[in-house]
């Protein structure tokens, strides 16, 4: 990774703080149910592995999407920062340790960090990674620091999601924001059943101002259960 040791340490501390915030049971409960994740399209902006190796942020695809180090300078993502904990479970409620989890989304201006987006450099948030990956620990949990998803033409706010594990192979889906007004007009959301919507709808809770200031400007937190057929 291109981050200097002090910056890497800072990113680790911020991620740990975000994870602690969403893990606190009196702050926010885990959302989700026994309905398995419905497969959904990955869309045209999934960062293929070859592009990740050669792209502008090569080697910097960690679980903190809100900080990018380039040319010796750390940039911070615009938008409302979100601490997101995902718990990977099978339909019996068993944790799937070792599950690989990838997320990707547009920046706060609705642009993807992807060559197919066609955005000019000036139109893309240079402080937002756009893609992150992590591997679940013994409790099947992964923690990301990202931004509250933003809408763009034709789509409600969402986060793309890809999971891999020997027990189920690979599944691609999307996460939505519970109660988001734009959901009703989204063509993919409208195709989902009520149970599937519940399985994909993140419940975002505001972070108290003092806590958010300590956690590097964290604004929202969510803990969400991802149920898979395994």
Model-derived regions: residue spans:
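Beta-strand-dominated extracellular/periplasmic modules and repeats
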Residues: 31-203, 209-230
């Amino acid at each position: 990774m291109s981050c200097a040791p002090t910056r890497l340490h800072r990113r680790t501390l911020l991620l740990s703080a975000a994870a602690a915030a969403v893990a606190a049971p009196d702050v926010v409960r885990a959302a989700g149910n026994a309905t398995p994740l419905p497969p959904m399209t990955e869309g045209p902006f999934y960062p293929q592995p070859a592009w990740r190796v050669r792209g502008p942020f090569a080697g910097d695809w960690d679980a903190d999407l809100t900080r990018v180090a380039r040319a010796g300078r750390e940039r911070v993502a615009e938008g409302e920062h979100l601490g997101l904990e995902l718990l990977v479970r099978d339909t019996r409620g068993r944790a799937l340790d070792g599950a690989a989890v990838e997320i990707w989304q547009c920046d706060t201006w609705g642009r993807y960090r992807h060559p197919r987006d066609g955005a000019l450099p000036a139109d893309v948030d240079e402080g937002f990674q756009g893609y992150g990956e992590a591997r679940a620990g013994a409790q099947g949990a992964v923690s990301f620091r990202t931004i509250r998803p933003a809408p763009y033409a034709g789509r409600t706010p969402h986060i793309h999601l890809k999971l891999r594990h020997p027990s189920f192979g690979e599944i691609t889906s999307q996460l939505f924001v519970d109660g988001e007004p734009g959901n009703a007009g989204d063509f993919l959301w409208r195709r989902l059943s009520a149970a599937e919507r519940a399985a994909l709808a993140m419940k975002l809770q505001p972070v108290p101002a003092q806590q958010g200031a300590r956690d590097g400007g964290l604004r929202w937190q969510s803990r969400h259960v991802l149920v898979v057929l395994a």
